[in-house]
Amino acid sequence: MNILKTIRFISQSSMTSWFLQTCYRRGICRRCYTPLGSYMIFGIVHYFCSYHIGIGTHDLHFGS
């Protein structure tokens, strides 16, 4: 039983890390976790939450 729980935990954590890497690379809104669109200003890509653009109250994560 403990072995099954351990395997399940490992698979869940690896899935979580994959999700975070994928979404944070694209950029997600840290407040609502919505995948972000992107636009360029002066050659720098900025990310914005497609649902909350223009509100300006969300903390944005800038993807690499």
Curated annotation (Swiss-Prot):
Lineage: superkingdom: Eukaryota
Keywords of this entry: Membrane, Transmembrane, Transmembrane helix
Please give the GO cellular component terms listed in this UniProt entry: membrane
Instruction: Tell me how this protein sits in the membrane.
Output: Single-pass membrane protein
Report TM segments.
33-55
Spell out the subcellular localization from the entry: Membrane
Asked if the Swiss-Prot or TrEMBL record annotates the protein with the keyword Transmembrane helix, the reply is yes
Q: What else is known?
A: Partially overlaps CUP1-1.
Protein name, entry field: Putative uncharacterized protein YHR052W-A
Q: What is the lineage of its organism?
A: Eukaryota, Fungi, Dikarya, Ascomycota, Saccharomycotina
